[in-house]
């Protein structure tokens, strides 16, 4: 895959990245020579079979793990651990149970130089963005799974990152809530100038949300594949081109 040398805010470049673990004393390679350029403001979905290294790649991008070889660049600078320009959203939002919605979102913003009033003002903006302005005073125990995940998204956006990294954020939700949240994410990503990298096992979700899909191989020596999703937004799951992309992915995974 070609790699552009010029970068803008939120651009990610991965060069010759490999990562392995030791399983019972034997090296197990999960990522092999990954090369990729993610454009500023792009939405990239990462899919693959279990064990293909999806979450591992996201954790390396987040700075939560080191690669064995290769490098990750954000805006042309090498990633060395976690950074304020990257925010991570996990499947479980991990809200602080003793804080209400507004305080969960504003938590930590004051340490970034904002006054308490500024921090709460910014938090209110993002709580409204995810549609929870009527629940600012609610506590996590009072929220549904979808509402809690919205709080997690608002909290991540409140730090105003250049890059949003999402590890199966909707995986624990029921089918109807998941569809609603996918629509919300598509709207938020349209309104916010942020690069998004999403790990998902849901192929339809990847097509609905992403500009491009990176398919990681499970087999040793396999090559990653990139698929362009050139569809208008908002996307119609019943549209012929959407269905064609779904069939293409199902065929690639041997599910059709």
Q: At which residue positions do the language-model features occur?
A:
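Conserved signature/switch motifs of ABC ATPase nucleotide-binding domains
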Residues: 138-141, 159
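The feature captures the beta-strand-to-loop junction immediately N-terminal to the Walker
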Residues: 47-49
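Short coil-to-helix segment of the ABC ATPase nucleotide-binding domain corresponding to the Q-loop/switch region
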Residues: 99-107
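Conserved ABC ATPase "signature" region
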Residues: 106, 110, 117-135, 187
């Amino acid at each position: 895959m070609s790699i552009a040398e010029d970068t803008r805010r939120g651009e990610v470049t991965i060069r010759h990245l490999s990562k392995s673990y030791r399983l019972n004393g034997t090296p197990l390679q999960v990522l092999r020579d990954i090369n990729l350029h993610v454009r500023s403001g792009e939405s990239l979905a990462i899919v693959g079979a279990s064990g293909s290294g999806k979450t591992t790649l996201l954790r390396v991008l987040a700075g939560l793990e080191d690669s064995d070889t290769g490098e990750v660049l954000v805006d042309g600078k090498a990633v060395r651990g976690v950074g304020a320009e990257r925010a991570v959203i996990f499947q479980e939002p991990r809200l602080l149970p003793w804080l209400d919605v507004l305080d969960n979102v504003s938590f930590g913003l004051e340490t970034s130089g904002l006054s308490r009033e500024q921090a709460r003002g910014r938090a209110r903006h993002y709580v409204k963005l995810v549609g929870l302005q009527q629940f600012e005073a609610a506590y996590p125990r009072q929220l549904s799974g979808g509402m809690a995940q919205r709080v997690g998204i608002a909290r991540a956006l409140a730090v105003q990152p250049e890059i949003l990294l999402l590890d199966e954020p909707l995986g624990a939700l029921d089918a109807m809530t998941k569809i609603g949240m996918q629509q919300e994410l598509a709207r938020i990503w349209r309104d916010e100038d942020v690069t998004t990298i999403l790990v998902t096992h849901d192929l339809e979700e990847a097509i609905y949300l992403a500009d491009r899909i990176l398919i990681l191989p499970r087999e040793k020596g396999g090559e990653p594949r990139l698929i362009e999703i050139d569809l208008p937004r908002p996307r119609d799951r019943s549209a012929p081109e959407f269905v064609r992309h779904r069939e293409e992915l199902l065929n690639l995974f041997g599910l059709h």
